[in-house]
Curated annotation (Swiss-Prot):
Monomer. PANTHER family: GLUTAMATE RACEMASE. It comes from Escherichia coli (strain K12). The gene is murI. It catalyses: L-glutamate = D-glutamate. UDP-N-acetyl-alpha-D-muramoyl-L-alanine binds at R104, G113, V114, V115, P116, A117, I118, K119. It comes from the Bacteria. Keywords: Cell shape, Cell wall biogenesis/degradation, Isomerase, Peptidoglycan synthesis. Belongs to the aspartate/glutamate racemases family. This is Glutamate racemase. The keyword Isomerase applies. NCBIfam families: glut_race, PRK00865.1-1.
Amino acid sequence: MATKLQDGNTPCLAATPSEPRPTVLVFDSGVGGLSVYDEIRHLLPDLHYIYAFDNVAFPYGEKSEAFIVERVVAIVTAVQERYPLALAVVACNTASTVSLPALREKFDFPVVGVVPAIKPAARLTANGIVGLLATRGTVKRSYTHELIARFANECQIEMLGSAEMVELAEAKLHGEDVSLDALKRILRPWLRMKEPPDTVVLGCTHFPLLQEELLQVLPEGTRLVDSGAAIARRTAWLLEHEAPDAKSADANIAFCMAMTPGAEQLLPVLQRYGFETLEKLAVLG
């Protein structure tokens, strides 16, 4: 069922049909991927965007790798059957670390993943101490440790895995206040350090949504680093050099996996990000 947004008594009108534009899917388990989408849209405003979020299986951080791979492939397949894709962005660190090989094997369009911005953080740190703030799944996965060994072996890496911060970011987009006390409790291991990290990698796409609150809690001068801008640049290059000619003149659309009250409450948020319609996506499996 498609749901149009209302603003007071003014109906939300669909966008005027335009020239066909390359269709780009941005996918996440929740709404954290909107932070990545926002960076891509800033660089590439004239694309046809689809945002899909898996509110049935959210969050992915505690799910098995086999489940995540099967689920992500099924969702991208379902979107591709509705709209031929020029490119897909898996805007979820957890899903990216395990599902990219399967996606790239199945589809002929480029698939971009999101990985923790450890390499730029290692370049930016002044005291040699880098914090990685991510889900527990990302913190534990061997891929993350390989990135650290490759790009930050001369740094002291302090890792914190938190599922609660994902929930805080989702709640913020639903209009709820973010508890600074909750953030202080989550970050307590760093806040108690004699010399805490001066550079923090936001290793989950939900966490840039909490940037304002994090800067209030972390020591003054702490740098926050995420992958959004780099993903946008990579997307632009691939669309120019490798993407198939898959275009649509339709308005931007968002897909959820179940039309729950929580999903419906996100309609005003999605409209602010430029998505005219929210629909339930039928996924096999």
